[in-house]
Amino acid sequence: MKKHLLILLSILFSFKIAAQTEPVYSTDGNETWYYIQFQNGGAVLEDMGDNAKLLTKAAAKTDNQLWKVVGTKTSCTITSKNGRSIYYEGGRFGTSSTKKATLNLYSTTNASYKPAWEIQQEAGQSMNQWGGAGINKELGQWSANDVNNPLLFVSPKDIEIRGEEPKILKEYAYSSVGTKFAPEEMLTLWYKDPVTASTVTNPWMEFALPIGNGQFGGMIYGGIHQDRVQFNDKTLWTGSNKIRGAYQNFGCLYLENLDSIFSTETTLKGVKNYYRSLNLQNATGEVNYASPDLAIKYKKEYITSYPDQCIAIRLTASENGKINQKFYMYNPNGKETVYEDGAGVYYGKFQLVSYYAKMKVIPIGGTMTTDDTGITVKEADEVMIILAGGTNFNPAQLSYIDDASTLASKITERVDNAAKKTWTEIYDAHVKDYQAFFNRSKLTIEGAENTYDTKALVDRYNNTSINRTGKEPSSLMLELLYYNYGRYLLISSSRGVELPANLQGIWNNSANPPWQSDIHSNINVQMNYWPAESTNLSELHKPFLNYIYNMAIVHDEWKTYAKNSGQTKGWTCYTQNNIFGHSDFMENYVIANAWYCTHLWQHYRYTLDKDFLKNVAFPVMKSCTEYWMERLIQDRRVKDGTWVCPDEWSPEHGPGKEDATAHSQQLTWDLFNNTLHAIEALGDDAGVTPEFVTSLKDKFKNLDTGLHTEIVDGKTLLREWKYSSYSAGERRHRHMSHLICLYPGSQLSGTNEYFQPAVNSLLDRGDASTGWSMGWKINLWARALDGAHAHKILKAALKHSTSYGTDQSQGGIYYNLFDSHAPFQIDGNFGACSGVAEMLLQSHTDTIQILPALPPVWVKGSAVGLRTTNNFEVDQYWDNGKAEYAVIHSGSGATCAIKYPNIDKAIVKDASDNEVSATVVNSNTITFPTKAGEKYTVHINDPVGIGTVSANNSSFKIEVQGNKVMILGNGFEKVDIVEANGAKIATMSKASFELPNTNGKVYILSIHKQGNKMVESAKISF
């Protein structure tokens, strides 16, 4: 019967009461009690005590949340069951036993929430969830009909009581692994303490470790006594296409240790040899520890599988029958978990989406029992837990949702299918799937060593007495980890549903995260995808690109915003966006559409995928171009005849509205330039009229480029505003919106007259800033071809941040290597990752620039598998700060152009070791033809040539090309060839020969001359 009841309940997903009538007014001896529940977010009012501020809370069984209304609709008082009445003072509502306010119940006209009520203390001003919807909000006053005003009077029998959050258990006493420990895999984050032992105010943000399959993911706490996996799904949002809402915490899975051999009080019964880790090479979290006597070793493994669409956890021990655990879940958004037959389920509904989560416990050996509090396993050999969750969100539906009645069966099927498999089957499929992306590219920095735990790496990096030169093994290791972590996070947060990674990727433990963890269009979501193409993760760009297509072409909201701005064609969006097409904040910032289009074009430039260009990118770009061709006006201030963007904003400072901001003009330049190139690439498939092309070219020809200068303190800077002066903004502002032309755009190169003013502006902006801002600056300094300064910013970006609230002076990282704005924002992780790639390889000019901004501290290393425009993949090797050789993999057979100092002397060979004829453009640039699917080795300083030639005024000249050696001069007889260690290679009677295995070798040549006993020597170093 319980199972049938669960199935029936699981399709209801009821969040709000459908109808709302006027509350019954209480009188003496006839009292009616209500929960007062806000429509947006579902929180209820709670009496916090005498003369205390009123707060919003999750509904619970407490008299503090029960209220009676006395009087009439237009003149009433509201009093809690504890006898305290609502009053208004000092800009906030509170409760008091001696004070009360005369209130009015106003019937809201908010279209999203009516029928509902608003509580007013004065006409036109309503009680409002201050700072956004959610729990723990103070109540202020705001204009009537705001989305955070409407509320319902809900009978106690109808309220949805949320499950009680599990009591947090004190961590066991423990000791960590010794100082000689090092992880097996170099690319591993590892720690000596469980998150559950931390005393910081936000251990989730500081220490928990992320896992994810692109859409569904979790944060691992690594606890021993009571472990926790907080989990998310990218589609779990409050709000709708009319209400911003916020990204939500899906809930928590708890694993409680029932072993009696451990104790919280004494190290005699404490855990031994504890450590937890996140292996970036196989996307696996682990917790390892031993029993107090070291006899039993325990391990927990955590993955989020893309093939099986679930979080999978395995618990093992070195002896059978030693796993004793209890498993339970917590739903922070609604109903309690229902447990049955080794499984747990909870579900609910927000304004638009319904959600469903299920976990299943699969023990091997031992016993398993289930009751209303969870699932208990005793004396098992091994336990596997499968956890899945999702919503009925569907971006292909105009309503954004599917029928909720099928959601439970979809998630249940997902869990059951995974539960039928062995751990090995699930794990092997996960690793194979993940490594197909991660292993495409590898960065090596010689000297890096992972011999300190990651917290210690961060501390050592920030200790100037330790990190003195930047070449210390621990310093190099942190930089190497941080780059690879960026690629790991992108794989883990950008697959599956056609939605981009948001401000926090997919990881969020709050009902009201900073900036709602939204899709922020004025830098943040774009930065999330900067490393996608260059670090060889092109497919992971697609969720963002397809999101743009869906919003711009399939759905209507963004087209409506275009009409609202006065245009009849095209689409646009504003600064803050949810997943349902809703967009708001700074509604004159409409240039975001052009910025989005640069991503569509970049994907084509890197892949040369004509189908994508024709069917996805170009329709969006053309529509956006039509919008701007219609919106542009001729300059109305200086009247120079140029076309300018009206009433724009340079995020997030300076004039709130001004024509021709550098930011908007540069992005429009990019849009028009890229659209013309797209038309050329598509030919007739572009489907545009000659009149359209002519009009576009005319607008482009006379477009203000956004490149203007001004003199500040004797230096020529790029202007941020065409009209307003430098002083209109903040000198050290975090946004560098007027430098789009330098990065991520490609309007400027080193030969452009505006290049140096742009660099001067960058220098003037300063170094330290928010985390994401420093991520941007790494890329900008790389484009400025200054590797030392780019590395200086990277070093600042790796400063440990000590703030978990909004604090723009606390940019850096947390100990889990999450980027800190502060607080956590994932864009900084991706910006730094992209910045490292830009230091090592650039191709925005369609010329591959080898090591354009190599930091001096990265003396020797390799970068394998980075990608460039024109569908090339490049492997680079360097030593002593100089490129030795590069391997070019041609994906489409385009002509390859390469730039590096004195590359005109390089030798190019194909895979068969045949020399390829290269055209010398200048001493620093060559080009050569390629064939699709072929690879080419460019020997730059490989070999470096003759080291020394000695012997009485040598009569021979030696030339080296590749591994070919030619001895020129009269009287040659033979040459003896030995390695530097004395090993003889050969004696050659010909003056032209090839040397084997040249990379890194040193050969000594002893040249014999006819009729002369003298031997002349030469040394050749490769």
Regions flagged by a language model, labelled:
Residues 1-21:
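Bacterial Sec-dependent N-terminal signal peptides
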Residues 168-585, 597, 602-604, 622-626, ...:
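Aromatic-residue-lined binding/catalytic grooves and analogous aromatic/hydrophobic interfacial grooves
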Residues 505, 509-510, 522, 643-647, ...:
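C-terminal catalytic domain of Rieske-type non-heme iron oxygenases
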Residues 944-950, 1000-1022:
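C-terminal tail/sorting-segment detector
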